[in-house]
Amino acid sequence: MRSFNRPADARRFLQLFVIAALVLVIRAPFLFQGERFFDSDEAVEGLMARHVLDGEFPVFLWGQRYKGVPEVYLAAAVFAGAGSSVIALKSVTLACFALFVCLQFVLVARLFSQAIAWMATAFLIVGPPSLVFWSLSANAEVVLTMLAGTAMCLGVDVWRRTGSQAAFLMASAAAGFGLWVHQYIVYYWIALALAIVHWLPRRGAILRHIVSAREVPRWLRLTTAVVAGAAAAYVGLGFAAFVTGGFDVTVAGVAVGVRHAQKLWNIAAGLLLLAAGARIYLIVTRHSPSSASLAYAAASAFVAGYAPALAAHAVGGGAPPIGRADLAGVGAAVSPILRDIVPIVAGFKSPSTGWLGVPLWLAAPPVVAVCASLLALRERPFTPVFHYLIVTTPVVFLVSGAFVDAQSYRYLMPMAGSLAVVLALGAWAIFQRSRVAGAGAFVLMLALFGLQQRAWYGQLSPDVQSRAIITCLDQAGVRFASADYWLAYKLTFLTGERIIVAPDNGVDRYPPYGDRVRAHPDAPRIPDKMTEFSCVPDTSSSR
């Protein structure tokens, strides 16, 4: 049981209060200009929150069978007290981000030191524009994934040090909750699994013990060996499909297509987890019978965290989509990734892909800090979970088929918190050799991120188009219209659903809007460009 230390607890509370206050104060200028980087995807979340107050209780984002939306319930509570607005909507994500920053501070302080925790926190607060954007986006999956992943890692660390079953159950519930929110949590699962293996004393002997499984009943040893063999076969087939782009084979006169590497690897991962999990469970419970109850409780906690998704799938079916990529596709993606995605994540391009004009030579301190942090792994046996995360995330991103265009950078954003820690560790490693160089690296990185934020803020222009269109629609007495996806839901939210604008392309996320628009044959179609729009509605292109 945890012993209470009132001075230490009071000091920690004050630290977290200061951190949360800094997050809110430094993000405030961007929050108050939130309409300048508010899009239709975010508007969907706001509309969902409004509908929660009307008795609708969604589990997933409208139009999807994945991407959980716990944030819309928080937004609904805010709307109930403060009314619906862009600022109110984005403030929910900001509050979740502040909680994440506080939680990661606690984790980093436990794993490393207070100094490193403060530096990592500074890099999160004064971070690149891509991080600022997602820390204020109503699509809160990035922030909630980082929050769930950090809670999972913190719970495992507390359990590892103290044996607290409550901490282990918290980690399990966070893992399930994160999976409901988004598949991004897999990044954290992989990194944590590698870190646990890294933590293990005599890990080579332990892994050999699991592979040999001499303590497992013979029938189960053979069964799990067959399952593991099947997993290996699927891995091989997936690799072949990935390298060749896919092919057909004939087995016993039946044509079999081997084309989707990612689907084959998913099957392999499931089989391998099943086989390894069975062996580990039996070996551990044989030596510690009480571990069985903890395993059952942890599984129950995971299910509880993932329960909304399980219930929705049980009622309506569906499954998350699986990306597809092969070696040729990955090779073709390298150039746009280096040209667009890397500069966006690093902060030299804005989230909308425009260059910010910040000198590229300022990238040198972060690069040196990352290298110093990686080299420090060989000199000091600290926990490499954050290093694993920034290495495995891009690899998974590449081979999973997640890349589509420059905006696919969002799939890399869950590693932003870990990157801040790696940069802090690098600055500290440099500081250990030269205080001047270490302090200089830290200051230069903060200056870089500050310049990037300032440049992006200067590029944010008022949303003149949306307000002008709304004024025109009001003057013309229009209450139903159609428009491009990226305009439709945004206008509907900004008008508080006084005007219903349904998309005539892209994803129809909420069919009742489209039904209401189609019920009015005179509903105009709003052109994509403001220069084409007249306050007198043109019904010639009505739906």
Residue map of PLM features:
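Aromatic- and kink-enriched transmembrane "portal" helix at the membrane-lumen/periplasm boundary
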Residues: A28-F32, F60-L61, V72, V86-K90, ...
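Specific aromatic-rich, kink-prone transmembrane helix
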Residues: L103, F123, V143-A175, A193, ...
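Hydrophobic/aromatic-rich transmembrane helices and adjacent perimembrane loops
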Residues: Y187, A255-A269, G357-P366, T383-Q432
